[in-house]
A protein has these predicted regions:
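Cofactor-binding active-site loop characterized by glycine-rich and histidine/acidic residues
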Residues: 1-60, 78-84, 89-96
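Glycine-rich, charged/polar anion/phosphate-binding loops
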Residues: 50-53, 112-119
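Glycine/aspartate-rich loop-and-adjacent alpha/beta segment that forms the canonical ThDP
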Residues: 120-172
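Short beta-alpha connecting loops at secondary-structure transitions
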Residues: 72-77, 97-102, 144-154
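Acidic, glycine-rich active-site loops and adjacent beta-strand->loop/helix elements
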Residues: 4, 40-46, 68-74, 105-108, ...
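A glycine-rich helix N-cap at a beta->alpha junction
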Residues: 58-68
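Structural motif
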Residues: 35-40, 65-67, 129-131
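Conserved thiamine diphosphate
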Residues: 28-32, 84-116, 156-172
């Protein structure tokens, strides 16, 4: 629904990144203040397309926020089998993109980090990279054999919605 700012979605790993950069380039070229935001998983951060997009986003100072949902697994494989970096945000650092790694399950941290990144992009300061550390509440897909993953992984205490509800309850 482009009329509400949603351009597209794709099932291709990292395929939404160049689409977000295209939207950001279009906004910048028209002199508009729109900001593109792309959400992707840690598996996408292991693709060549990811690095090409980081390079161009930085080179062209595009108004884009790249949000990596890092749950530590690329489909079935632990992240340690795919990369040597401790933080996936380190990749963006290499391209001169400001980064922040946060607890992606804590909405009180996500919202202000996103606001800073969006303001940067909207004010012409270029891209930002947010690495949101999280966990899987469900399998990678409906038939995922890892649905039997340990209870610590599925702990409802980590659920961001329930966690924020507790935060609101405690604040009243």
């Amino acid at each position: 629904a482009p009329e509400v700012g949603f351009v597209t979605a794709t099932g291709i790993v990292a395929g939404n990144l160049p689409l977000a950069l295209g939207a950001a380039l279009s906004s910048k070229g028209r002199g508009e203040s729109d900001v593109a935001v792309a959400f992707f998983g840690d598996g996408a951060a292991q693709t060549g397309l990811f690095h090409e997009c980081l390079n161009l986003a930085s080179l062209w100072q595009l108004p884009v926020v790249l949000v990596c949902e890092n749950n530590g697994f690329a489909e079935f494989s632990p992240l340690s089998a795919h990369t040597v970096v401790e933080r996936l945000a380190d990749h963006a650092d290499t391209y001169g993109i400001p980064t922040e790694t946060i607890d992606g399950n804590d909405l009180t941290l996500v919202r202000p980090a996103a606001a800073v990144a969006i303001d940067r992009a909207r004010n012409g300061a270029g891209p930002s990279f947010l690495e949101c550390l999280t966990h899987r509440m469900r399998g990678h897909y409906e038939g995922d054999p890892t649905l039997k993953r340990g209870t610590a992984e599925r702990d409802e205490a980590k659920d961001p919605i329930q966690r924020f509800a507790r935060f609101l309850d405690d604040a009243t």
